[in-house]
Amino acid sequence: MIPYVLGIDSGGTKYLVRAAALDGTILGEFRGNTCSHYYLGKEKAARETLNNLGNCLARFGGRPQECLRIVCGSTGYDSPEDGALITNIYENLPGFDCPVYCVNDVELAHYIATGGVGVLALAGTGSIAFGRNKNGKEVRVGGWFKSIMGDEGSGRYIDAKALHHYSRWLDGCRPSSPLLKEIERVVGSPTRKALMDYSLHMASPPWPAANLGEMVDRAALEGDRYATQILHDAAACNFDLVQETIQLLHMEQEQNLCVGIWGSVLMNSAVQREEFKRLLLTHYPQTTISIPKKDAAQGAVDIALRWYREGGSCWKILRNRK
């Protein structure tokens, strides 16, 4: 018998589950496809979730009945109805009979980056800001679907901006540049039909991972002014989300304002990250910027272990309340 806990990062394009023994030793992990109920529907999301967990347990011969806690940070947890649906999936996994705590992935990241008080900017496949002040008030800004101009500053946003730039080149409005050559290689051929086919693929759920950001980064580092403009625009969008969160929480005058950075787009793009930092420190020079060294799945594992050892409420742990 190997008692263990599970920490899960259920994102929009990937699913990462990690198992740990009660002393914190990592027993196994598995990376699978998204289990978002928005993309798959509840029944398929439940099947894929069980499949992902089963693959993780197979790494170390774990059995469902030996699991003592599950903590999951999930995309698509955008309302009480979403929360009830996602929690229901985990509470009804065949063979598992342990306490479960599901939360929006940005709240999990917020705890990892700030310890429970401060503001988090998350820019990965999508984007959102989340904050909590010392009085316990919570605010989230952004995180809406792209069809209502949401996810500004995210990987999807950068993809759309890059393809828009490419479309203007096809129209004859833009000169050739390193970025356009990179995009042409991905699209396949410099034709309207190829661009329409590629954009249709990107717009059809389950949406593929945002994948043009690295090209935009490389082009910006080579001096492509349009690529730099796209990344600076994305940084400004993410700063706006954070600033609105700060203002809603009345944290403008906080002497020790902590702002965490999370997500592949902000973490991996030096050009966007540095512009975001510049904007943030220009407006709020008292800010301490936190860039966590652990990923969301490990953060979920750590919380699950603490929850098991201390008992009580996982909700309170995430908010640093006794």
Go through each PLM region and give its residues.
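Acidic, glycine-rich active-site loops and adjacent beta-strand->loop/helix elements
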Residues: 74-78, 105-108, 126, 145
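Conserved phosphate-binding catalytic cores of ATP/NTP-utilizing and phosphoryl-transfer enzymes
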Residues: 1, 98-121
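Short beta-strand-loop/turn "lid" adjacent to the catalytic site in phosphate-handling enzymes
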Residues: 54-94, 101, 111-114, 258
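ATP-binding/phosphotransfer module of carbohydrate and carboxylate kinases, centering on a glycine-rich
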Residues: 1-66, 113-118, 163-322
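Glycine/charged-rich beta-loop-alpha catalytic/anionic-binding loops adjacent to active sites
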Residues: 91-94, 137-146, 279-288
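Glycine-rich phosphate-binding loop of actin/hexokinase-like ATP-binding domains
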Residues: 116-173
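A short glycine/serine-rich beta->alpha loop
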Residues: 37-38, 76, 143-152, 286-291
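Glycine-rich beta-strand-to-loop/alpha-helix junction loops that act as flexible
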Residues: 71-77, 123-125, 257-267
